[in-house]
Amino acid sequence: MKYFAIILLLIAQSCQKPIKTENASSYIFTWVKDENDWNSDYIAVINSNPNDRGYGSLVSTLPVGYSDINAHHSEHRFHEIKELFVNGFSGGRSFIVDLNEPENPKLKKTFTNIREYTFPHSFERLPSGNVLATFQTVGQGNNEVGGLVEISPDGDFVRSSNASDPQVAEFIRPYSLAILPEIDRVISTSADMKQKDLSNVVQVWRLSDLSLIKTM
């Protein structure tokens, strides 16, 4: 109920005229699902500068043009290029949002599969500025395990590595990830969003070549 209350508050605020802030230096960017799936999911920009007269107010919104896609994960941190990858998992669709002007956010690109990899889930920005993403599956349906896919800031394929591991019998569906560049590692977790089966593994990868080292 609390989740829906927050969404309802944001929806109510979105009906008001956006407020132009003065001397604002910080914002909260939220990726919001429409409660009833009637209207588009959207990015909401909120003024989080406690010294500004508009503190806590809705600055702007950006509908992405799709409803019933289950606004889900975004990048874990906001990168200096001020763009954000966000995911609508149920629709298998992701979006790149340009937030260089918080009062006027722009939809840069939308994408679904990247080559054979489908149903993107989580995103983590690499030191290079590229994004490393988990994709739950390969192909349509929920039959083949996905993997890690590196994507350029423009949403183009860079490289990939499959998460299947012939050394283990466990059901694998890549879920979230953490990047550890100082030790050349990536850690990914596993959970099946479509709930076909339990998926309780952790995988360790080499960041430099995306090779799978160990499934536990």
Stretches found by the model and what they are:
Residues N36-N39, F89-G92, Q140-V145, M193-N200:
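Short, solvent-exposed loop/turn segments at conserved positions within beta-propeller repeat blades
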Residues L99-E182, S190-D192:
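Asp-box/WD-like beta-propeller blade repeats and closely related beta-sheet repeat scaffolds
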Residues V45-G54, I96-P105, S152-F157, V204-I213:
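Short loop/turn segments immediately following beta-strands, especially the blade-tip
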Residues Y55-R125:
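Blade-loop segments of beta-propeller domains
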Residues E22-A24, F78-I81, R125-S128, L180-I183:
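Residue-level detector of Asp-centered blade-edge/turn motifs that repeat once per structural unit
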Residues I11-S14:
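C-terminal motif of bacterial Sec signal peptides marking the signal peptidase cleavage site
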Residues A24, N39, N70-H73, F119, ...:
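Beta-rich catalytic cores
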